[in-house]
């Protein structure tokens, strides 16, 4: 496809729904559910050990509870299954399913969860891997992360398009972007 965008779609499910599922199932505040999701969740229950336990903060003065990591995965897996099933339906609707020889590339923070790639491979029946920005000159390690893949990819795509129409040089745009992101992280972390 020569790097051209052939299809885009929106799937109305993401990490916030997973956090909400965890908060409701474990009866814990959302901020604790988010931390539990990031630190312990697994998208494929068979990969999470039943012997591994985590502490789940309770509401109010109640003491934290122990929960097996596998039980947490049993809360998370159905939402990831739904997400990947919707993505597969979108790929089929696009008419490009047979034109994906190298498989599927997952991006975004939700893709980083343990077991996400393996579950996606089960659903898509094709190779799946995590995608992170790699080919932009000057990218710091902070930005070389699946969380930023979409934003950086769109910037690079736009910069290349600008170059072909006589706009600013793509490497100049990428360099300026990296500087601004690095400065932002320096101020906030």
Describe each region flagged by the PLM.
Residues 1-189:
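Helical "lid/coupling" subdomains associated with nucleotide-phosphate turnover
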